Amino acid sequence: MLIYKCLYFRSFLKVIHNLRIKSSFNREPITEKSILGTELLFLTKKQDRMKNLCILILVSFFISCQEKSTNPDIALIQKAQLIHMKTLTLDTHDDINVKNFTDSLNYSMDTDTQVNLPKMERGGLDVAWFIVYTGQGELNAEGYEKAAANAQAKFEAIHRLVDQYEPNKIGLAHSRASLDSLRKIGKRAAMIGVENAYPLGENLSEVKRYYDLGARYMSLAHNGHNQFSDSNTGEFDGSTKHNGISELGKRVIDSMNYYGIMVDLSHPSKESIRQTIAHSKAPVIASHSSARALSDHPRNLDDEQLEWIKEKGGVVQTVALALFVNKEKHEKYKAAWEALEDKTDTLALEALKKKTPPVDISDFVDHIDYIKNKIGIDHVGISSDFDGGGGVEGWKDASETFNVTLELVKRGYTKEEIAKIWSGNLLRVLDEVEAVAAQLQAN
């Protein structure tokens, strides 16, 4: 540690010098806000985290000497920063558009997307699960062919990111071991989830091909019933197709268990979820769902479903999508925002937020609290649904990821609990799914 302190002491002095100049000019003391504003703590490479840590220690020492501050917020923020830097942060649901994966426009740049590498670096997000999503179409050869082409284009886009656009900064991970390997060489990780098994058609050999392309979770359905499963959208009109999952759906689950792909429960109907859990030989996940007790929406999970997932050894990745976090609060804010005449008027927008607050990060973490209290700390995780409708005040994009850790620290979560919530629980399930696959393949 002393060696690192010596190596980076000049950097520290430069930061403090700049802060002193700013402080002197503004006639304000150096505070946590001035430090946070330097982007000091989230440098752009994972291998720089030791530098971050050393500078943080020196800055903390400087503040204590300068102010003898009694402000508890400073200590809380510093504690959260240390935890955030040491924790593997993983978001299980980030949608993509292939238009953002070209030579001239891609995630190596700070695009207007909610997730890209610069935003991940600024927010300290280590792992993004990029989603191969296809909307539900007709259940015929033409529909399957079109969906398969859509899915293939998204697989290829993700591979271009890690192979061509930013191979020195991000790699494709398939397991905990490959994640660890990427971390050791200072890279962030992309992982792949498939949202809607519809593009498989009726060709179950595609499950193996998707696995080989990097898919490590897949949902049987999305918005609309398909050849494998009923969707939770049937709750709106009372419709079903299979009264759960079809025989073909059971065979897809068997294939996913065999190869080591986690079964995702976030879009199928309640009866489909019950039957899927009963049929699967491996634990399951809900990649982006929250607690229905707090926000009554079919995409969320009721207490009975939460218990089913716990009993199966699975994990619920709480989602930061405003409608699913607090339906009533979101609808009130949305109505007020739509009534605003000039939506570019910053002052009017701030006044609106004070009068009619939007769904925020505190509301989101309420769901983590609820699920933790209902089924235990080992069965809850985090997802954003960024670039697919997700985002709440305080976590509007990947650059604000630290705020989630800060809110957890404010609520008294320990560093061990935060590590489980951010990635430990999800990776435990992935490990167990891989173990089941190895056993099935050995028999």
For each of these PLM feature ranges, what is it?
Residues 52, 270, 398-401:
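Short alpha-helical patches at coil-to-helix transitions and adjacent helical residues
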Residues 27-28, 34, 40, 76, ...:
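Generic signature of intrinsically disordered, low-complexity, basic-rich segments
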Residues 66-240, 292, 296-443:
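N-terminal hydrophobic targeting/anchoring segments and the immediately downstream early-domain regions
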Residues 242-289:
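Loop-centered beta-sheet repeat module
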Residues 10-12, 22, 33, 246, ...:
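Proteins with a high burden of low-complexity, intrinsically disordered sequence enriched in S/T/G/P/A and R
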Residues 6-75:
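Bacterial Sec-dependent N-terminal signal peptides
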